[in-house]
Amino acid sequence: MHDRLKKTVVMVGMMGAGKTAVGRELARSLGVPFLDSDAEIEAAANATITEIFARDGEEFFRIKEAQVIARLLAGAPCVLSVGGGAYLNAATRARISDEGVAVWLQVPLDLLWSRVRRKDTRPLLRTDHPRATLARLAETREPIYALADLHIAVQPGWSVEYSATQVKAALATRSDVLTTSGKAQGGDGDDAG
């Protein structure tokens, strides 16, 4: 089986949704690079996201984030994980829609909380009531994430690998995004590894 990615796949969703882990596995299975906009921003700024938020503020960060995403979308097709707030920017959303395909990893709040509650690397959760903050962020952001081209409803118990196969299967329904050589013979590509 040979898959060919024609557009960059942009993983969107809440912090803790698995965008980086699932994105890495998806990129591996497709044989394309994996890029992370947060890692690219940190490398360019020589500072962590938390430090950038503290030093320069969220507005400055969002401007730089949009610039980095635009640069990454202009490159060869890859799998790109973006920060939880990146897709909220209308111009960034439009660019992703024009130049790539957005995949929303939709994860239940309890599962998100179980993944992020012990991490100190989430500047937006540095509040007196971080779970309530996470719930409020999800309530605000999910209607915007729902604008993504493809939705994957991640379930508790799904492995990273299984989640990636679900994303790949959804991508295979879009011939403008992914061509799977085995598809013409009736294969669905799930056994490609």
Regions found by a protein language model. Give the residues of each.
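A glycine- and Lys/Arg-enriched "phosphate-lid" helix/loop adjacent to the NTP-binding pocket
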Residues: D98-P143
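ATP-dependent small-molecule kinase phosphotransfer cores
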Residues: D36-S97, T121-R122, A135
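Hydrophobic anchor at the beta1->P-loop junction of P-loop NTPases
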Residues: M11
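P-loop (Walker A) phosphate-binding loop of NTP-binding proteins
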Residues: M14
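Conserved lysine of the Walker
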Residues: K19
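NTP-dependent small-molecule kinase module
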Residues: H2-R4, E25, S29, E139-G193
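Short, well-ordered beta-strand core segments
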Residues: C78, A102-V103, H151-I152
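Hydrophobic positions on the alpha1 helix immediately C-terminal to the Walker A/P-loop
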Residues: V22
